[in-house]
Amino acid sequence: MKDIIPLLSQLPQDNFFLERSLHNLGYDIIAGTDEVGRGPLAGPVIAAAVILPADCDHHLFQDSKILSHKKRVHLFQLLTEIDAFIGIGTVSEKIIDEINILQASLLAMKLAIEDLASNCSRPSFLLVDGKFKVPIDLAQVALIKGESKSASIAAASIVAKVTRDRYMQDLHSQYPQYGFNTNSGYPTKKHREAIGEFGITCYHRRSFKGVKEYVDISQEKGGRG
């Protein structure tokens, strides 16, 4: 791990520099992992872990937050076409309420890595987005704003975002009044107003501000919570 520290101090613009450097240090399978869904009032937190082929056009993969929906979907499809290895981890709103959103996010990434390992080889090194390492016995480094520093993390952020958006789109068909198809569970004005009018669903995070205030009210209304 000491050999990695110099790599982090002077990262070039190349967003596959870390992956190549780690491979040169003897880590043959490098995965990036990221999660989506820490801020919403409803729905799960979903993480992805991705191993990119060494010969792919890694510059295409950028932080999902700066890409359009159309571009994210295109890149998600591209990942399947270039035979990238992908793992998905999902932690429900119920578990989020039980263990808090930070621990749920780390758990989702752990599950994504385990899913990745079950579909292909176990990674030898992890590039993790954020400040905290994943609770799993693998060599790893946590990178703040990792999506801008690693193509593998960026690819994972795209997969997680598209996967979660599709989940919330399906949820919208059950509860159209909350606008999950456009807000993905985030606390938009329309979403907050719908909670006030209709109460909460079983998919809302009861420990979150903006939801917990309506738990008893929803029960009194006979709400879906």
Swiss-Prot record:
Its cofactor is Mn(2+); Mg(2+). Pfam families: RNase_HII (PF01351). It is an enzyme of class 3 (hydrolase). Signal peptide: none annotated. Residues 28-220 form the RNase H type-2 domain. It is found in: Cytoplasm. Gene3D superfamilies: Ribonuclease H-like superfamily/Ribonuclease H. A divalent metal cation binds at residues 34-35, 129. Endonuclease that specifically degrades the RNA of RNA-DNA hybrids. This is Ribonuclease HII. It comes from Desulfotalea psychrophila (strain LSv54 / DSM 12343).
